[in-house]
């Protein structure tokens, strides 16, 4: 097992909090203190698409456009959006592997069973001194509410 079982699902305080989280995920914050030459190794997935979006292959300006578009699309839903950062506590692993990917899929299925649906998944591989981790943006869909 690679990841902690104790995954805390957090609620956004407001739209600004949501925007800050997206900046962290997309590495588009103004300070750029986490962006480095390894940032293109990060991966970004949307909903049920198993293919990397390639957003981290883009330069900062283009990533900001993508992030802002995503924010514009989702910022009115912040009242039912949540987020989680899932850590790998093992200090001997810094690169993702296929087994971690499978475990991540299992975690995502478990969240869906609890009515939290992944909208965006970002794997950060650009912090070699930090543990492997991934971020999930989740949309909670209450099963008791008729749409």
Predicted regions, residues:
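Positively charged, glycine-rich low-complexity segments
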Residues: 1-132, 138-147
């Amino acid at each position: 097992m690679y990841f902690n079982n104790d995954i805390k699902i957090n609620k956004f305080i407001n739209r600004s909090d949501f925007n800050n989280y997206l900046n962290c995920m997309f590495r588009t914050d103004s300070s750029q203190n986490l962006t480095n030459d390894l940032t293109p190794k990060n991966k970004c997935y949307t909903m049920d698409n198993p293919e990397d979006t390639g957003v981290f292959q883009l330069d900062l300006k283009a990533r900001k456009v993508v992030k802002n578009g995503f924010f514009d699309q989702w910022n009115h839903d912040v009242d039912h959006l949540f987020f989680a950062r899932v850590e790998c506590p093992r200090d001997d692993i810094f690169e993702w592997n296929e087994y971690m990917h499978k475990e991540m899929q299992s975690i995502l299925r478990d969240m869906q069973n609890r009515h939290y649906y992944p909208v965006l998944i970002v794997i950060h591989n650009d912090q070699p001194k930090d543990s492997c981790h991934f971020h999930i943006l989740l949309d909670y869909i209450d099963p008791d509410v008729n749409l």
